[in-house]
Amino acid sequence: MAVFCDFENVAIGCRESGYDNFDIELVLERLLHKGKIVVKKAYSDWDRYKTAKRGMHEASFELIEIPHVSYSGKNSADIRLVVDALDLCYTKAHVDTFVIVSGDSDFSPLVSKLRENDKTVIGVGVKNSSSDLLVENCDEFIYYDDLFREHQRETKRALKSAKAEKAFEPQRDPAGKRSGEKEDALELVLETVEALLKDREGHLFGSMVKQVIKRRRPHFEESYYGYRTFSDLLVDADERGLLVVKKDEKSGGYIIEGFGPNA
């Protein structure tokens, strides 16, 4: 997967929609559910967005400098992004998914050309500043607004959970720490399954869920949370009524059929 970000477009869109700043991590978190990202490029006059540079660097983006003085009619960032995307399309056949982070309708011809070359195109933009033409041309369009709302809900849930855990802390025995760690692992699995089921119908293979978790959290090891294998983690989720899991007789692995009654 390759990500091309028209930073100024989404930054302005966020500001006009009342968001403090554009958070690229919210976008990457969603994209990592879909596959591995091998190219990340962001285009802007970075002198105008100095405070955003650090976050983009930390997210491993290559920052392409497009001085504002060079803008003449057609946005130079748009042109450079299109050239780089098409170059990658024609030279790197293994990159099969292109993500355009922008709501600009000027990218519609690029989207069409990429799809002509059998590429999947995902758009990401702020709802109020995303062109209907661009949205309709993409195979999928993710609104930043939805990502932001999901992040807020998750933050509230985490704070509520932390408060409950703190209230319980004085009564905890030494074994409680291990139990708490298991809860963290189970929560991560449930979040991942929920995100995957948004894009897929039917069941999920346990191995797929672990692959996505490793993309999101490269340091993840189930043994840290007290599980001998990832399958043990899934079985525990099933026994707690969080997931409905069954063993696949052919592969010997586990299939997740959906959420349990206690999820």
Name the predicted role of every residue range.
Residues 10-11, 70-72, 128-133, 149-151:
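Short gly/pro/ser/thr-enriched loop/turn and capping motifs at secondary-structure boundaries
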Residues 43-45, 96-103, 110, 114, ...:
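Acidic beta-strand-to-loop metal/phosphate-binding motif
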Residues 135-136, 140-149, 158-163:
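Conserved phosphate-handling catalytic cores of large alpha/beta enzymes
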Residues 49-53, 126-134:
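Short, glycine/polar-rich helix-capping loops at beta-to-alpha or helix-loop-helix junctions
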Residues 59, 117, 136-138:
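Short, structured coil segments at secondary-structure junctions
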Residues 63, 98, 121, 141-142:
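Short, well-ordered beta-strand core segments
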Residues 1-90, 110-112, 120:
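Domain-level signal for Mg2+-assisted phosphodiester chemistry and nucleotide/NA-binding surfaces
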Residues 124, 154-263:
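N-terminal regulatory modules in eukaryotic regulatory proteins
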